[in-house]
């Protein structure tokens, strides 16, 4: 009887030990201008207010639930005087998307819009390392279920850049509050 118990223990103990070993966590991305994917609402508000450039942080709560919030403000980062429109979307108090938007080069012949894109690419590469291409005018850095995305558009000398910090684990929770779109066919 004892030999059966011992043999069962020798078979089961390694299996339970393997089951208890946690999967290694992927390190999250470094923060960008003090913000990171999945940042909590309170930390976002504190940082956004400290960077607000003659603007008031505005937040709107969903009409259907208080668990969905959108915020936005014009900011100026004192470290390099960069200006952005900062916005974020929160699900259950955590940001699924934090976005920085900027533009340059309207009505000028010296192509400052091109310089904006070049400067933004250089800045993000310095922080996050080598990017993966994402389409014709986009880059991406992946950190498990979190990602940093840069996209840019242009017309003439004008350029628009958008940097988004995405947390897909938080984004998946939105399904609890938003119904799937129905069929559009009559």
Regions found by a protein language model. Name each.
Residues 1-8:
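Bacterial N-terminal signal peptides that target proteins for export
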Residues 5, 24-27, 87:
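Short, functionally important structural connectors and interaction interfaces within domains
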Residues 11-19:
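Hydrophobic h-region of N-terminal signal peptides that target proteins for export
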Residues 72-92:
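Compositionally biased P/S/T/G-rich terminal and signal peptide-adjacent segments
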Residues 6, 90-94, 102-104:
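Generic secondary-structure microfeatures
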Residues 20-70, 97-186:
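Non-cytosolic coordination micro-motifs
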